[in-house]
């Protein structure tokens, strides 16, 4: 037997098959937890190829497992290794379980996918549950349309796992805005495990953004596509608005995203080079700093982007994607009903005049703070309190805490 580990430990599994959202959310949660408890260490397991591009606080570290990408048709493929996908998935599952056995976490948090990618955390959950380790599932505010999510979860046999393998379910949002499990046959025993934490606030990065990332002296609009893997239509739409010669109130800073195809990035950079009031970068790990200095935002409306809009109280136009999931559309629609953002639907035609009008209206639309919603950004406070209760709780009983907004 090796030497016993010291201090409190939390292990986080970050689902990583597409984009940046899961990693950025897990990183933000890890930082909030260690900032609140000097005796706590957090280890993140992820297959993201760019996890090393992010800064991590003291007592937060990561293990990168072999990467797997989920294609738009729903199939999986490896990111770089020329190994059979099934072999990669088996390797990932083995690394995850061995890490949990060695790290001996006091709490295990799973992000978004209850059983992990293709069930890769099921054995780890079963092992830790048998050891008495609290297991927590973290869900974003919206998953997908019930008509799509229900058969997916039935196929994956998720509902029994929620009952048998998890002690608690955190929903990173407010019930009055979105219920991620609405329309699903969720038993009362699972509903009792759910805690709505409120959204996760974001703060300016401690590291400064590169000076050449913000070339404008005047206020600018930040345009971001998240990871960028499917953001080309939004970037094209915005660029056409600036190429039209119409008068627009502010210049635009485009963040294309690290997963946008290289050929597409090159084409966009060529178009940007011909415009005086548009600048483009591929990626900046300090996106919070760029947003904090912006007058407003145009984005696709992923979870992290929405949290940033609320946190920095920025006017925003959301252009949600509707494939392969309706998640962004559902979030943007609900937020627009409350006046937190405005939404511009992608009708497939993407008329230039529609984007011109949206950019002109952006500086005068209401700010998110003008909509008063108790508990809206209480996410980290709720998570910290729940975590502390679990770490202090030796009886195995579920700690009770008022849900954000109640």
Segments (PLM) and residue ranges:
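C-terminal amphipathic helix plus adjacent low-complexity
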Residues: 354-406
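Donor-nucleotide binding loops and adjacent catalytic segments primarily
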Residues: 30, 184, 199-296, 348
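A short, glycine/small-residue-rich beta-strand->loop->alpha-helix junction that serves as a flexible
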Residues: 14-27, 50-51, 231-232
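Conserved nucleotide-sugar phosphate-binding/catalytic loop shared by glycosyltransferases and other
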Residues: 6-9, 14, 32-87, 91-93
């Amino acid at each position: 037997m090796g030497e016993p580990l010291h201090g409190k430990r939390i292990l986080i599994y970050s689902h990583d098959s597409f984009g940046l959202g899961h990693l950025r959310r897990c990183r933000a949660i890890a930082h909030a937890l260690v900032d609140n408890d000097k005796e706590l260490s957090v280890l993140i397991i992820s297959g993201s190829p760019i996890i090393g591009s992010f800064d991590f606080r003291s007592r937060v570290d990561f293990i990168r497992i072999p990467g797997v990408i989920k294609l738009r048709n729903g199939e999986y493929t490896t990111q770089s290794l020329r190994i059979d996908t099934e072999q990669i998935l088996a390797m990932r599952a083995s690394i995850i379980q061995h890490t949990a056995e060695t790290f001996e976490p006091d709490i295990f948090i799973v992000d978004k996918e209850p059983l992990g990618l293709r069930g890769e955390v099921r054995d780890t959950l079963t092992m830790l549950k048998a050891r008495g380790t609290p297991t927590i599932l973290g869900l974003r505010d919206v998953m997908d349309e019930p008509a799509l999510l229900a058969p997916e979860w039935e196929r994956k046999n998720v509902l029994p796992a929620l009952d048998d393998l998890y002690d608690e379910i955190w929903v990173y949002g407010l019930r009055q805005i979105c219920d991620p499990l609405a329309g699903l046959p969720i038993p009362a025993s699972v509903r009792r495990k759910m805690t709505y934490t409120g959204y996760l606030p974001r703060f300016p990065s401690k590291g400064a953004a590169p000076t050449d990332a913000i070339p404008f002296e005047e206020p600018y609009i930040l345009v971001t596509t998240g990871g960028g893997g499917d953001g080309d239509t939004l970037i094209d739409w915005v660029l056409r608005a600036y190429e039209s010669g119409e008068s627009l109130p502010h210049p635009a800073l485009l963040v294309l995203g690290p997963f946008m195809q290289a050929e597409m990035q090159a084409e966009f950079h060529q178009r940007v080079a011909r415009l005086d009031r548009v600048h483009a970068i591929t990626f900046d790990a300090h996106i919070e700093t760029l947003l904090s200095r912006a007058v407003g935002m145009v984005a696709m409306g992923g979870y992290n982007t929405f949290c940033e809009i609320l946190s920095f109280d920025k006017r925003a136009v959301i252009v949600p994607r509707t494939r392969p999931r309706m998640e962004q559309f559902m979030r943007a629609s609900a937020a627009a009903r409350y006046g937190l953002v405005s939404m511009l639907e992608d009708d497939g035609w993407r008329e230039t005049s529609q984007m011109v009008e949206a950019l002109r209206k952006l500086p005068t639309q209401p700010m998110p703070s003008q909509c008063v919603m108790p508990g809206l950004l209480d996410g980290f406070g709720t998570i910290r309190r729940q975590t502390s209760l679990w770490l202090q709780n030796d009886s195995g009983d579920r700690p009770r805490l008022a849900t954000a907004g109640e």
